[in-house]
Amino acid sequence: MDLFSSKRLRHSQTDGRRANHEMKFDSRSPIESDLGRVIFSSACRRLHDKTQVFPLTSDDNIHSRLTHSMEVMSIGRSFALNLFEMDEFKVKIGVDSNNLKQCVRGLRDLESLLSTICLAHDIGNPPFGHFGETALQCYFSNLFEELEDDLKHSSGSKDFYNETILSMLKTTKPAKHDELIQDLADFLADGSLAKFDYIYFDGNAQGFRVLTKLQFLNDLYGLNLTSASLASFVKYPNFGAKDKRSISTKKHGVFSTEKEELKAVMDNCGIPALGDTAYYRHPFSYIVEAADTICYLIMDYEDAISKGWVRYEDFKEILKNDPNGKKVLNESEKHFNENAPSKKKMVQLRTELMNHFVNVSIDNFMKHYDEIIAGNYKKELVFDGGEQESLATKIQDICRKDIYSNPEIESLELTGNAVLTGIIDYYMKYLFHPEKSFRMHAKHLMSKAIFQAVMQEHYNAVGEKKDAWDFYDDFDPADFSFEERIRLIRDFVSGMTDKFAVTHYRKLNGQQI
């Protein structure tokens, strides 16, 4: 395996200039340069106004996706530094401990790679947190059921088709009608990989699409990150059906539109395939997952304390009832007096808990490394307590009970669902409208970069050698297929921030000018 593959999907002239020492004050490796590409991307900036747990909060102390991702990045860096102190780890990744140059290069690349992917791990998440994913899944599942029912009962009669199908027929030449209906039927068929991209919508899959395509400048290579970074990013390297028997296929982790990109980066890293539609995980994806879990377990609880929903004393009681938790608690209490403020106590406890979970994760990573490489390890590092229930599992159960099901969160999640459903309804109506003027109005309200990215995919799919930006002004959305139009809607909506989505929804409904 080449776990640090610096190959990109498109050749980078900048990498070549660095290698030839043409860039005097830039000695970064290709993997190191990936971090800058993510930090300076618009998709990363938008994380500042996306929900972590608490939707539409005005409390500046509460985590957004961006602050959460920055903390995950910090933990990822800690993993890199701790792992590289272990000679056993260096042997496993092919670094000679006696070769200073190899050690420096290896540490710099590992630290940068984990920092990059930890920062980017939520870059594809829609507005309103994980409930936003559920809202998109439900919308498209219901839509497809309606369309399937129409096709099933129409018997070819246009009188029974719904508005979406009729609009497509009205904007298509009669000679192409049968082909259009057949294409729609194929898309809706059971086992359709393209259909999975919607009914199993996942922020991880959208994130891979953002990194590989949707940061659109003048081609469909997105940020053009190294294969090592992209392979490590993919939490569920699977573009087929979900299958919980394997950790790789637990979710539909890559859209069918990016299956060739997945194959390329995995092949570049030497990651074996798992059947026809999946791959083993890149080993470093386990580390990224652990860093994410450590942060959300602890910081979500800390946010709940800030909001007054739970108390430090409640958290203390959880830890007292676990042998490892008790050790962590005792260690943290050495650093403050009993009458210290709760905030001081929680910060110290956070530090000790993070240290504990990092150590647990590293121990499990090294203990099971051969299983991980062979694709046989099926647990999360943080939750693997061996024969005993892990401390992380107990904290997660409490978070689900006392935080994630809080009426305030659930109420705002339903608000988010109404907003997302309303926006998609609007674009479904007007991107499929029989009148061109309505379609063009809808087009001009959408992100130009995302529209051009889908245009470029369309041209590539039909074999037309055109550049999207040259034809954008006159392009009619009716020239898109059904799937391309809903792909455009999905990409646009999932990229919105919480506040932009609310404002956009109000404007579309005439509630705001």
Describe the predicted segments one by one.
Residues 370-465:
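Substrate-recognition/cap regions that form aromatic- and gly/pro-loop-enriched pockets
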Residues 327-347, 351-380, 438-439, 443, ...:
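Polyanionic (Asp/Glu-rich) segments that form extended negatively charged tracts
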Residues 50-60, 398-402:
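A short small-residue
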Residues 44-48, 149, 216-220, 239-243, ...:
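Intrinsically disordered or highly flexible coil/loop and linker segments, enriched in small
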Residues 444-507, 511:
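C-terminal amphipathic alpha-helical interaction region
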Residues 1-22, 442-450, 457-460, 464-467:
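Soluble, amphipathic alpha-helical scaffold/repeat regions
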Residues 1-27, 39-50, 59, 66, ...:
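Sequence-structural signature of the catalytic-core scaffold of metal-dependent phosphohydrolases
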Residues 32-45, 384-391:
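Acidic, low-complexity proline/glycine-rich segments
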